[in-house]
Swiss-Prot record:
One of its GO terms (cellular component) is chloride channel complex. The keyword Transmembrane applies. The record marks E314 as: Mediates proton transfer from the protein to the inner aqueous phase. Slowly voltage-gated channel mediating the exchange of chloride ions against protons. Functions as antiporter and contributes to the acidification of the lysosome lumen and may be involved in maintaining lysosomal pH. The CLC channel family contains both chloride channels and proton-coupled anion transporters that exchange chloride or another anion for protons. The presence of conserved gating glutamate residues is typical for family members that function as antiporters. This is H(+)/Cl(-) exchange transporter 7. Keywords: Antiport, ATP-binding, CBS domain, Chloride, Disease variant, Ion transport, Lysosome, Membrane, Nucleotide-binding, Osteopetrosis, Phosphoprotein, Repeat, Transmembrane, Transmembrane helix, Transport. Residues 206-213, 288-300, 304-312, 545-559, 560-562, 563-574, 575-578 dip into the membrane without crossing it. A motif (Selectivity filter part_1) lies at residues 203-207. SUPFAM superfamilies: CBS-domain pair, Clc chloride channel. It catalyses: 2 chloride(in) + H(+)(out) = 2 chloride(out) + H(+)(in). Belongs to the chloride channel (TC 2.A.49) family. ClC-7/CLCN7 subfamily. SMART domains: CBS. Its main location: membrane.
Length: 805
């Protein structure tokens, strides 16, 4: 753990800087806890001799890691450490994004120079970017689908030929070894590239994108390298036979594509195409990432409307009508691109019948009709889905806690992934080998039928579920005719795949949980339908396919707790509006029942990572708290004209300041300093880099006036303060912040209630909210962590502890 008082060595320091140093150095209290209410008394502002650095009130300091000395630059991802992450902690390592434009003089001057034609051009560029997002997301989805189809097909053909060969000769243990080895080999490569190259590419990426859109800066989450590892990893995971799907990671992939395209450059490749420079800020990037997430859903399921609703329900924290149109446009372009390219690949250029990575097939409303009497049955299935989803999430919670504590090294993570791959193949082989459920072989009933000990013209039905990609297994459970599976086969498959999927989610591989959830639900849903037909004998229950559909919706809803978007996704993926109402009932019931026991899977993992995630509303019992009780103090304030040495020292000491600094000024020597504006750390970094000093301007040493473009060129990887050399003479210079600060920051009185502060902060996407008294003096600063630390628990309002990492 780094000491917060660690200083950066500079070329020189004068006596005034040494006098100011005690205010800049704060040592963390080992084991110091955070008080229940972070109250701040009316502390007087303190000023160091001959400097303009202010501290207001009191603060409990915390320890930070070395890599966080400059929060505005993404830290290099270290190997995971054994840290006490859980849902009762809030990590200090996460920083916020700036979703509120800083309306300083540079910004206003640029906006005033833009005429109506230029604004129309900017709007056209937004639509062009959305089209590019849709096209590239669709192409990435095509690449994943084609590679998975070919590699998985090759693997299953080799294993099938080997099993057919050794079934007659004996020695099926060699077939088991071959299957387990192939699976382990693919997963080994997929896990190594994630664990050692880009850990943020693990999982589906949906929790990370939710956090990004919420305003939390997740390092490396939208990097080009992350996209490459994500795509490669998900291919290897699916081909490796894990209980995963390739659809969930498409949401992350689409988001990365959107973040890259919208900036008109690649910082990873160090290529700047000099286009779309206007959009190089967090506010614009956020909107395009929302479109990318929707395009990913659209490409995965062929559901453009569902993609828009998913982005609204699970992703985008900020919304407007124009954004809705652009997101829908990107989603439509994405699914059309995928459809068109796959039609060419399959040799049917004008047959646009493959809108998504998974095609659930058409459900014939006439053959699969439902009546009003089945509504209670569907609701009961929703209850089952909610309970099973809660069990799934609870088991995965304890498994994740175990991994955080004991499997935190990359080598151990790779070993676990390979072990799961081998166990998955072994369990599948044993179940297929032990099953005597033989069914007549029908044309096209399955891609790789295994005969084993069945008679000629028959195949092992357990293999139809296990010996296939998960997407094809889902379609098989939906559409295979009645009698294709016996109850024992479905029961065993449900039980085994449930635990395999639970064990698999959270591995250090790129994979999603959508398809495994659908597959589990389709299996027990089909079993539910078969049991119902046995009990009643009525023809109305004859087709188990509709119960497989309802079970799939119930299981997925019980795990991820989405209602609106999942209803539309299922309707679009099945090309059937008839079942819209029962699907909605099932999903709502599953969510209500599941929420009684535990959070949804994505929200649970966000909490386990101790992310300061802000929900839509403040806790319902928080009206008794005020801004004065939740704000952070002391606040580091700067003057309009500030010494360079003071600014350098402030930026070097991240333990005692935030990433925004109120700018204050005295009316005269007898009056207290009043708030004049707010300036960000990133802006100060750029000013220091370009040496925008008053003395240099007076001597004519500044070649040109700083423009907004200079700040955009530095975005998003602002250089660390350690990389900027400031000489002893330059430390004595002065910096005028008037032109660069935001002169109208959002403020609240210290008596404002927590819900009101929360609503203002959350709705406007703020990073800092200044708390002032009735004389407009700064008394505190509200940040994301100050609001996220209050959460409604089972026993009322809870305050989370701050993690020392």
């Amino acid at each position: 753990m780094a000491n917060v008082s660690k200083k950066v060595s500079w070329s020189g320091r004068d006596r005034d800087d040494e006098e100011a140093a005690p205010l800049l150095r704060r040592t963390a209290r080992p084991g110091g806890g955070t008080p229940l209410l972070n109250g701040a008394g009316p502390g007087a502002a303190r000023q160091s001799p001959r400097s303009a650095l202010f501290r207001v009130g009191h603060m409990s300091s915390v320890e930070l890691d070395d890599e966080l000395l400059d929060p505005d630059m993404d830290p290099p991802h270290p190997f995971p450490k054994e840290i006490p992450h859980n849902e009762k902690l809030l990590s200090l390592k996460y920083e916020s994004l700036d979703y509120d434009n800083s309306e300083n003089q540079l910004f206003l001057e640029e906006e005033r120079r833009i005429n109506h034609t230029a604004f129309r051009t900017v709007e056209i560029k937004r639509w062009v970017i959305c089209a590019l997002i849709g096209i590239l997301t669709g192409l990435v989805a095509c690449f994943i689908d084609i590679v998975v189809e070919n590699l998985a097909g090759l693997k299953y053909r080799v294993i099938k030929g080997n099993i057919d060969k050794f079934t007659e000769k004996g020695g099926l243990s060699f077939s088991l070894l071959l299957w387990a080895t192939l699976n382990a080999a693919f997963v080994l490569v997929g896990s190594v590239i994630v664990a050692f190259i880009e850990p943020v590419a693990a999982g589906s990426g949906i929790p990370q994108i939710k956090c990004f859109l919420n305003g939390v800066k997740i390092p490396h989450v939208v990097r080009l390298k992350t996209l490459v590892i994500k795509v490669s990893g998900v291919i290897l995971s699916v081909v490796g036979g894990l209980a995963v799907g390739k659809e969930g990671p498409m949401i992350h992939s689409g988001s990365v594509i959107a973040a890259g395209i919208s900036q008109g450059r690649s910082t990873s490749l160090k290529r700047d195409f000099k286009i779309f420079e206007y959009f190089r800020r967090d506010t614009e990037k956020r909107d395009f990432v929302s479109a990318g997430a929707a395009a990913g859903v659209s490409a995965a399921f062929g559901a453009p409307v569902g993609g828009v609703l998913f982005s609204l329900e699970e992703g985008a924290s900020f919304w407007n009508q124009f954004l809705t149109w652009r997101i829908f446009f990107a989603s439509m372009i994405s699914t059309f691109t995928l459809n068109f390219v796959l039609s060419i690949y399959h040799g049917n250029m004008w047959d646009l019948s493959s809108p998504g990575l998974i095609n659930f097939g058409r459900f014939d409303s006439e053959k699969m009709a439902y009546t009003i009497h089945e509504i209670p049955v569907f609701i009961a299935m929703g209850v089952v889905g909610g309970v099973l989803g809660a069990v799934f999430n609870a088991l995965n919670y304890w498994l994740t806690m175990f991994r955080i504590r004991y499997i935190h090294r990359p080598c151990l993570q790779v070993i676990e992934a390979v072990l799961v791959a081998a166990v998955t193949a072994t369990v599948a082989f044993v179940l297929i080998y032990s099953s005597r459920d033989c069914q007549p072989l029908q044309g096209g009933s399955m891609s790789y039928p295994l005969q084993l000990f069945c008679a000629d013209g028959e195949y092992n039905s357990m293999a139809a579920a296990f010996f296939n990609t998960p997407e094809k297994s889902v379609v098989s459970l939906f559409h295979d005719p009645p009698g294709s599976y016996n109850p024992l086969t479905l029961g065993l498959f449900t039980l085994v795949y449930f635990f395999l999927a639970c064990w698999t989610y959270g591995l250090t591989v790129s994979a999603g949980v959508f398809i495994p959830s659908l597959l589990i639900g389709a299996a027990w849903g089909r079993l539910f339908g078969i049991s119902l037909s046995y009990l009643t004998g009525a023809a109305i229950w004859a087709d188990p396919g509709k119960y497989a559909l309802m079970g799939a919706a119930a299981q997925l809803g019980g795990i991820v707790r989405m209602t609106l978007s999942l209803t539309v996704i299922m309707m679009e993926a099945t090309s059937n509006v008839t079942y819209g109402f029962p699907i909605m009932l099932v999903l709502m019931t599953a969510k209500i029942v599941g929420d009684v026991f535990i959070e949804g899977l994505y929200d649970m993992h966000i909490q386990l990572q101790s992310v300061p995630f802000l929900h839509w509303e403040a806790p319902v019992t928080s009206h008794s708290l005020t801004a004065r009780e939740v704000m952070s103090t002391p606040v580091t304030c700067l003057r309009r004209r500030e010494k360079v040495g003071v600014i350098v020292d402030v930026l070097s000491d991240t333990a005692s300041n935030h990433n925004g600094f109120p700018v204050v000024e005295h009316a005269d020597d007898t009056q207290p300093a009043r708030l004049q504006g707010l300036i960000l750390r990133s802006q100060l970094i750029v000013l220091l880099k370009h040496k925008v000093f008053v003395e240099r301007s007076n001597l004519g040493l500044v070649q040109r006036r700083l423009r907004l473009k200079d700040f955009r060129d530095a975005y998003p990887r602002f250089p660390p303060i350690q990389s900027i050399h400031v000489s002893q003479d330059e430390r004595e210079c002065t910096m005028d912040l008037s032109e660069f600060m935001n002169p109208s920051p959002y403020t609240v009185p210290q008596e404002a209630s927590l819900p009101r502060v929360f609503k203002l902060f959350r709705a406007l996407g703020l990073r800092h909210l200044v708390v002032v008294d009735n004389r407009n003096q700064v008394v505190g600063l509200v940040t994301r962590k100050d609001l996220a630390r209050y959460r409604l628990g089972k026993r009322g309002l809870e305050e989370l502890s701050l993690a020392q990492t």
